[in-house]
Amino acid sequence: MAQIKVYGLREHLEPVKQRLSDAIHSCVVEALRFPADKRAHRFFHMEEGDFYFPASASEMYTIFEISMFEGRSIDAKKQLIRLLFDRVCDQADRKPNEIEVTITETPKHNWGFRGSPGDEVSLAYKVDV
């Protein structure tokens, strides 16, 4: 399971939202071996004055916060980050200094879905990749 939040200025996020979602999804499927039908992305459109970013970035600055079960290898997480930089830059007109990625991992028992705690749900994919 992974939940992905995307933050950016409304005027620069809205026009590329679908391309960003597609790029994110392709990265998660490849790096974490997610099933193609597992997509959970939320876009947070910020207004100027509510979103401050580093001086080294432009108004295109975009933050990706990924929350997922613990258990993925360091290599898989690094591959996900590298793929996100490559594909978001390519498909959504961002530069590397305009992208920030954070991954937060929590135990399965801290999740709840399909009516049960996450550690009691049988998944159709592997977490230990």
Q: Residue spans of the language-model regions?
A:
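Interaction-mediating elements
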Residues: 1-129
